[in-house]
């Protein structure tokens, strides 16, 4: 659908993107993971044809775009930025705006607005103005506005940065439905690994201006010895704690939010890949629960969220032996 060839993009003398080849196929779900400032937003703007690369070419459906062709291609690609701007008027007016620009009017426009609002859960917001919306609601409205216009390609910049869990699930369901029904192509940029796993089949890392496929080494910047048989390295991506385990068969990545870790005081009974033994390093109480920092025997520090009752019942004090059990869904094997 969209392809970058021999692209180098600069701001002043600084090269922010160096991409010999990158393709976003029709119907794909691609995630770009990188730290803040890595160039994710710039990459999305190139894919949206809102910026031209300093060097190289952007192809749409196999053809270089220029002149009037840029406008035609742009109408089929929609970018929802991290801090979207809503127009004056109500949420309903915003959802209808893109349709009017495409010549969709009357009953057809009302059906499209109602459908997009229902899918993103913004029906109760249709009569509100921008000043009456939270940041998370603004993001949902912006995505609903994009989907109402029926793009072939949807580009999302940090789509869950201001959303609660219910909104994230609604967005995920809406995108899956659009993809199943009409082959929507989705590319999202995020520094949250859990977003990438939830919404994509193809995860790329962006660092030093270059895209790479996901591996433990290039995602978490850890160096693992070639002869390693067992071991753990630690890293953090956004709010997610990461343990990278190695064994004789390869690498297992545990992408584990603190709420997906169970802590027990029982001795480690098995050598399951989703368990680590350790000792409590410190307890930091954060209402309504407690954040329990456990330093595992193998040297990786992870954070679990448990209740105050569990802290008392398990006698979770520094030095207490504990076992970490990760939810099976949190274990990703490469």
Regions from the PLM with identified roles:
Residues 107-126:
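Conserved ABC ATPase "signature" region
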Residues 48:
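Helix-to-loop junction immediately C-terminal to a conserved catalytic motif
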Residues 154-158:
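Catalytic Walker B motif of ABC-type/P-loop ATPase nucleotide-binding domains
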Residues 33-35:
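The feature captures the beta-strand-to-loop junction immediately N-terminal to the Walker
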